Amino acid sequence: MRVTTFLLLLAMAPLRQFAEAENRVVIAVSTALDGKGKVLRDTRIVVSGSKIVAIDPKASPIDYDLRGLTVMPGLIDAHVHITSSFGPDGKNAGMGGATLEAAYRTAANAYATLLAGFTTIQSMDSVAALREAVAHGGLPAPRILSITEPLVGRGEQTGTPDEVRAFVRKQKDAGADFLKIYASGGMRQTAQTIPQTALEAACDEARKLGLRTLVHANYDAVHGAIAAGCTQVEHGLGATEADLRAMAEKGIYFDPQAGQLIQNYLDNRARYAGTPYFPKTPQEFEPMRELLPITQGVVQRAHKIPGLKIVFGTDALAGMHGHNVEDLINRVVEGGIAPMDALVSANSLAAEAMKMDDQIGALALGLEADIIALDGDPLKDITAVRGVAFVMKGGTVYKNEIHSMPHSRSHSKSVR
């Protein structure tokens, strides 16, 4: 998305209603998930500036009393299309618009995602301006990792392996956090769409540059992405057991979706119908329903593979921003993943896949103070992830609804 930082700052000005953290903040918790699979009981998290500096049950005075809630690290969505939105006419407006109105929509998508408890997202759209504005404290939004331009098999990208390598270097120089490669088409298309030599050249050059490669791969392209040594396979429809085991053996991360994307198309069929790349009429969306058990089946099979690193990514498009947890719920309810494993996939494992586990993804000393609180216990009822009552990102509180929770105890501060 090509909009200036100024445009994004202007777009988000009305939404900047949050409180800067004081130098030292103490958060009291009765139950906290550390993001790595452990549960902390009856302790206090001490934040100084943007970092967690202590976990001390005797720290005082208490600034935020979150006892009675479930506290955990901010969630991470490893695959979003943050510029995708519905336009003024209510229809799908696609991705990457360069108008002021499109900038407002993108900023609103990001803000809704933050308030839903997601403190870091990985955008498959080019949103470098938004990324920088957020990083410099100008916008209330999740921390953003972004591509600059995807490798999709057009123009300069269809040349020799050397030309593909030059394209990858161009992305690195332009400030890409990672490289997105489209190696296959839609959900029903089985053929690999990029030459294997080009895919291998791209992944190899990116690896030399320290750039991660995320490959959109279904069916034949799953094997191609694995053979090329990519960092992460996205979607993975049609992945065989051999493919899944190969990913585990090679340490390749896997980012399947469990059904929210398909359900979103079905729920919003009237808004997507007749727009580019979608069926012309709402009635023509019904066959998509057949894909729900297929996507859920991929998650079910992947979860049974020892050592396979499954990260949480939703492929969030228009209609999904701010509702990203629905795919997390789907992974547990339909995919059979244990609640703790699902939550870790959206915390420390996602951070590890992004090479940011030394900064985010856990409640640990020295990490960013990305802290959320849920009204309920997601280990007993995964739908509790819908009830985000408190959001802190990098030591700054963006949401505080704990005063409205009937079972919560007294609280000494409010950002509202």
Which functions belong to the PLM regions below?
Residues 100, 208, 280, 291-377:
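His/Asp/Glu-enriched, well-ordered alpha-helical/loop segment
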Residues 69-136, 197, 220-221, 225-228:
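Metal-associated gating/positioning segment near the N- to mid-region
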Residues 82-101, 153-162, 185-193, 275-288:
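Acidic/histidine-rich helix-loop elements
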Residues 103-129, 141-152, 174-187, 212, ...:
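Divalent metal-dependent hydrolysis catalytic cores, especially in the metallo-beta-lactamase
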Residues 32, 36-72, 93:
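Histidine-rich, glycine-flanked metal-binding segment
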Residues 189-293, 311, 316-318, 336, ...:
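Active-site core of metal-dependent hydrolases
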Residues 346-348, 352, 365-407:
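C-terminal cap of metal-dependent C-N hydrolases
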Residues 149-204, 224:
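Active-site gating/metal-coordination segments in enzymes
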